[in-house]
């Protein structure tokens, strides 16, 4: 398939809308992550902060509501053959029904952008949007009852069915929660500054603290990126959920530690800044990701930090026995849908099965390389029970010398404990990623 050319326009409104169309096209057809693609465009173009906010809002609104938006477009038009026209209809439909927009203005702008894409499609675009606007209630009533939840909330039907099995009492709340907005969170290095000093700096840059967990703060804006403490690495992007996985590793001075699926390195850095291991070995299976770990090592200069190219399912290749192992598993990523909403459309039920097998292989390899008395923290950024509770149950049954340990979770973090002692960072936490954490000791 020939890749579509990027669109360019002459008018300011046209330029922004065309950039939005190109970003969405990259996400849906070139399989780029939304947050990465947005940052890429923002680094290349001189947008104002207001424009960045608008672009981010439109892109996320389209992606998070894609199934429902496409349903409305399919009901309101004949088959849309032009890919960029389809993206334009998606953007405009999102504005009409999910954003505080002037309907007439949205349709007028769509016509102006259509002129740049293909002037022969202007009439089609205008007519399609007017039909959708006029007939939305009728189209809503035509959604089959057994598919309503999946279409309206934009979840694949197989996943809706799975959630009903895993969480029969609150699956709808979970679905709704992970369609909400995400928040910027950062962690400051407590070795470089106090909490009071960091909070004082936030006030100086007109940034409000929305929520915090220890050294992780959720912020009202991105002003922190312009500060020296961010540029020099004393403050890094990290979610409190992943921080808690590291915190529960509870490394003692002089211990040998493995971060088995380490890239891009945020958890490895947290281990080095929170604890004082004799040695931390961080590995990844992909060369380009190992380069990210090497860059982290070179930037911070920790003498006890080692980086290796290695398959996490073959940890024994390292020929090292570890006191502590962090297994932040490759997973379906359902807990980070607020930040990466596109993941839901790429995932299949077979992917969950494949991931579960891989997670078992990684754990079994880690178990072989864990010292007697050593501990593993198992974590994922998903709420899929097959990848979490069911795996931990399997490990406990297979290895009789394993015991599950209590977790240290701050009082302001709501969790859902499973029957084994593992913890899901609850969907009710407005700011935090969905995560699962379990801690096991080899006796």
Task: Describe these PLM feature segments.
Residues 1-443:
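S-adenosylmethionine
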């Amino acid at each position: 398939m020939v890749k579509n050319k990027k669109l360019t326009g002459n008018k300011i409104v046209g330029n922004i809308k065309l950039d939005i169309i190109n970003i969405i096209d990259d996400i849906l057809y070139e399989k780029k992550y939304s947050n990465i693609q947005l940052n890429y465009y923002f680094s290349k173009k001189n947008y104002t902060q207001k424009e960045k906010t608008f672009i981010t809002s439109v892109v996320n609104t389209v992606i998070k509501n894609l199934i429902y938006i496409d349903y409305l477009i399919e009901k309101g038009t004949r088959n849309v053959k032009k890919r960029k026209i389809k993206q334009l209809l998606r953007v405009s439909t999102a504005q009409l029904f999910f954003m505080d927009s002037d309907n007439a203005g949205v349709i007028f702008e769509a016509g102006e952008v259509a002129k740049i894409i293909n002037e022969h499609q202007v009439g089609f675009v205008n007519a399609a949007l007017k039909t959708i606007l006029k007939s939305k209630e009728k189209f809503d009533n035509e959604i089959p009852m057994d598919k309503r939840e999946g279409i309206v909330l934009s979840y694949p039907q197989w996943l809706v069915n799975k959630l009903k099995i895993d969480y029969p009492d609150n699956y709808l709340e979970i679905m709704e929660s992970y369609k909400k907005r995400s928040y910027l969170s950062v962690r400051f290095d407590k070795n470089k500054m106090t909490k009071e000093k960091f909070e004082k700096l936030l006030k100086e840059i007109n940034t409000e603290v929305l929520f915090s967990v220890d050294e992780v703060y959720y912020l009202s804006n991105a002003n922190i990126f312009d500060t020296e403490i961010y540029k020099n690495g004393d403050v890094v992007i990290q979610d409190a959920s992943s921080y808690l996985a590291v915190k529960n590793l509870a490394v003692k001075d002089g211990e040998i530690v493995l971060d088995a699926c380490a890239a891009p390195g945020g958890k490895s850095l947290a281990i080095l800044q929170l604890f004082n291991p004799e040695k931390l070995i961080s590995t990844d299976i992909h060369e380009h990701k190992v380069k990210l770990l090497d860059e982290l090592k070179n930037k911070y200069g920790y003498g006890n930090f080692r980086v290796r190219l290695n398959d996490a399912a073959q940890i024994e290749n390292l020929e090292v026995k570890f006191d502590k192992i962090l297994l932040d598993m490759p997973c379906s990523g359902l807990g980070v849908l607020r930040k990466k909403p596109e993941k839901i459309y790429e995932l299949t039920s077979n992917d969950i099965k494949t991931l579960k097998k891989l997670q078992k292989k990684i754990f079994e390899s880690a178990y072989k390389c864990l010292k007697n008395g050593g501990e593993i923290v198992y974590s994922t950024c998903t709420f899929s029970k097959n990848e979490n509770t069911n795996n931990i149950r399997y490990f406990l049954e297979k290895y009789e010398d394993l015991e599950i340990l209590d977790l240290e979770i701050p009082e302001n973090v709501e969790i859902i404990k499973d029957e084994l002692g593992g913890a899901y960072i609850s969907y009710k936490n407005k700011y935090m990623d969905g995560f699962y954490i379990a801690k096991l000791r080899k006796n």
